[in-house]
């Protein structure tokens, strides 16, 4: 449940501190009211980390190189499985986001200055881990004139120098008000896959994505694709925030109308009681319906299921798309 926030009762805060939970969501236009939690169904299962996997090795390497992963910051339920397999989604430009999306567990606050050594540290870490496929994402950096596009480009360049055979997917923010500049910068160092998530249906944007615009995000994906027609584009949404099945299908249609190639749909799981509540748990049969409809609409790949997240098995998704593209070229 949500209501309008009353600014008169909002306490003071230190903007330089990282705010999470209630401290983060208290200043958004919509106030999150705690609700009784829906019981988790049997099909919601998370794989725990095992000491016999690379889970702790990956964590130690990340800390040693002063790197952050969205897996940790966003409390991803798949962290045990992904770290255990030696994969991670790197989050650049710090751990303080300039937005306050109440579904997300990444902290909000005044961001620190960019770490000029981060591209080098990131590239060295990826090379040391001998990763074949990496996903690089970031917090929103509305404080930067290019929205952080230049830092993305520098990270891509350094990774390519040290690991020329590593494929790079970037999961970018919307570069609000800076799209032209951001796309121009990325043209000089394009990724292998361009990902930007719509997150939810447009009706829920005021509640779930304050500060973002549905059409603007769609346009970002379409414009990148127009400039890089051979580079796969990708987007994802969560279900369980109050959307209807028809709204999910319409978002999928909108993606295809804006030339998005790859799709992810997963179940929203609230990180804490201070975040937006789960309003429904989508049945596996419904996820199957989404997947079938996705391929009918022409998506080259659709990763759809309760535990799917934007970067989950991203290497397998991209491999399927590029293999299909190669088949078309060779025919």
Swiss-Prot record:
Pathway involvement of the protein, from the record: Protein modification; protein lipoylation via endogenous pathway; protein N(6)-(lipoyl)lysine from octanoyl-[acyl-carrier-protein]: step 2/2
Subcellular location: Cytoplasm
Cofactor binding: number and manner: Binds 2 [4Fe-4S] clusters per subunit. One cluster is coordinated with 3 cysteines and an exchangeable S-adenosyl-L-methionine.
Residue ranges of coiled coil: none
4Fe-4S as UniProt keyword: yes
Region (Disordered): 1-20
Pfam families, A to Z: Radical_SAM
Gene expressing this chain: lipA
Full protein name: Lipoyl synthase
Alphabetically ordered keywords of this record: 4Fe-4S, Cytoplasm, Iron, Iron-sulfur, Metal-binding, S-adenosyl-L-methionine, Transferase
Cellular component aspect of the GO annotation: cytoplasm
EC number in record: 2.8.1.8
Species of provenance: Janthinobacterium sp. (strain Marseille)
PROSITE patterns: RADICAL_SAM
Cross-referenced SMART domains: Elp3
Family: Belongs to the radical SAM superfamily. Lipoyl synthase family.
Keyword 4Fe-4S appears in the UniProt entry: yes
CDD domains: Radical_SAM
Transmembrane segments: none
Gene3D superfamilies in the cross-refs: Aldolase class I
Residues that coordinate or bind [4Fe-4S] cluster 2: 97, 101, 104
Residues annotated as domain Radical SAM core: 82-300
Molecular function as annotated in GO: 4 iron, 4 sulfur cluster binding; lipoate synthase activity; metal ion binding
InterPro entries: Aldolase_TIM (IPR013785), Elp3/MiaA/NifB-like_rSAM (IPR006638), Lipoyl_synth (IPR003698), rSAM (IPR007197)
Cofactor(s) it depends on: [4Fe-4S] cluster
Catalytic activity: [[Fe-S] cluster scaffold protein carrying a second [4Fe-4S](2+) cluster] + N(6)-octanoyl-L-lysyl-[protein] + 2 oxidized [2Fe-2S]-[ferredoxin] + 2 S-adenosyl-L-methionine + 4 H(+) = [[Fe-S] cluster scaffold protein] + N(6)-[(R)-dihydrolipoyl]-L-lysyl-[protein] + 4 Fe(3+) + 2 hydrogen sulfide + 2 5'-deoxyadenosine + 2 L-methionine + 2 reduced [2Fe-2S]-[ferredoxin]
Residue numbers binding [4Fe-4S] cluster 1: 71, 76, 82, 311
């Amino acid at each position: 449940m949500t209501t309008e926030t009353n600014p008169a009762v909002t306490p003071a805060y230190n903007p330089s501190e990282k705010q999470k939970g209630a401290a983060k969501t208290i200043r958004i236009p919509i106030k999150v009211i705690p609700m009784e939690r829906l019981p988790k169904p049997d099909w919601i299962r998370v794989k725990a980390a095992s000491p016999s996997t690379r889970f702790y090795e990956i964590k130690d390497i990340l800390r040693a190189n002063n790197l952050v992963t969205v897996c940790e910051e966003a409390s991803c339920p798949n962290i045990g499985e992904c770290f255990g397999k030696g994969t991670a989604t790197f989050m650049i430009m710090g751990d303080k986001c300039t937005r306050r999306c109440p579904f997300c567990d990444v902290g909000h606050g005044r961001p620190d200055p960019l770490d000029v050594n981060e591209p080098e540290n990131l590239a060295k870490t990826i090379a040391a881990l001998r990763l074949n496929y990496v996903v690089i994402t970031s917090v929103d950096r509305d404080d930067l004139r290019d929205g952080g596009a230049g830092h993305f480009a520098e990270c891509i360049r350094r990774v390519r120098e040290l690991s020329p055979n590593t494929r790079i997917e970037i999961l970018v923010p919307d570069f609000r008000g800076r799209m032209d500049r951001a796309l121009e910068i990325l043209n000089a160092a394009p990724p292998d896959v361009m990902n930007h998530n719509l997150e939810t249906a447009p009706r829920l944007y005021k509640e779930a994505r304050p500060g973002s615009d549905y059409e603007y995000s769609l346009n970002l994906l379409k414009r990148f694709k127009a400039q890089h027609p051979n580079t796969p584009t990708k987007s994802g949404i969560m279900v369980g925030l109050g959307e209807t099945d028809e709204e999910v299908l319409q978002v999928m249609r909108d993606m295809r109308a804006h030339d998005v190639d790859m799709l992810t749909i997963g179940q929203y799981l609230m990180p804490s009681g201070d975040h937006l509540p789960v309003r429904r748990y989508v049945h596996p049969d419904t996820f199957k319906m989404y997947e079938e409809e996705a391929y009918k609409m022409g998506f080259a790949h659709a990763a759809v299921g309760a535990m799917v997240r934007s970067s989950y098995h991203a290497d397998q998704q991209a491999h399927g798309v590029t293999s299909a593209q190669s088949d078309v070229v060779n025919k």
